[in-house]
Amino acid sequence: MEIKMFHILIGALLGLLFLATGTRAQFQFFEQMFGGGGHQQQQDHREQNVASDSSWYQRNYDNAHCSDYLCPGTLACVSVPHHCPCQHPDVEDKFELGDGSAICISKGGFKANEAARKVELARKGLL
């Protein structure tokens, strides 16, 4: 009889322990999510995000000095528009069109010049 009571008591204590742990974790979650708990002494030292409108870009564009052509996508200063670099050269290929303009397109698969081949197929209406 004593052993059975001992098991019941241990089970009840473990149940209370799990309940208390879960409740504390839940309150810590809400405290973190909603900034509660009166722990507002800690400050967030992360860098601030850029604005969600075009003000950051416009400010940099307006302050960029270029005597030739200022590329709108990269703010690079080049002699002619089709010399503008791609914004993401690691994942984009630049393809110069015959009319003095250029486009940047996602790099193709595993073959060299695959992106250029796809542009030519598209120009011919085959893609």
From Swiss-Prot:
Keywords: Signal. Residues 1-25 form the signal peptide. GO terms for biological process: ERAD pathway. It comes from the Eukaryota. The keyword Protease does not apply. The keyword Signal applies. InterPro entries: LCL2. Probable component of the endoplasmic reticulum-associated degradation (ERAD) pathway. Belongs to the LCL2 family. PANTHER family: LONG CHRONOLOGICAL LIFESPAN PROTEIN 2 (PTHR38425:SF1). This is Long chronological lifespan protein 2. It comes from Paracoccidioides brasiliensis (strain Pb03). The gene is LCL2.
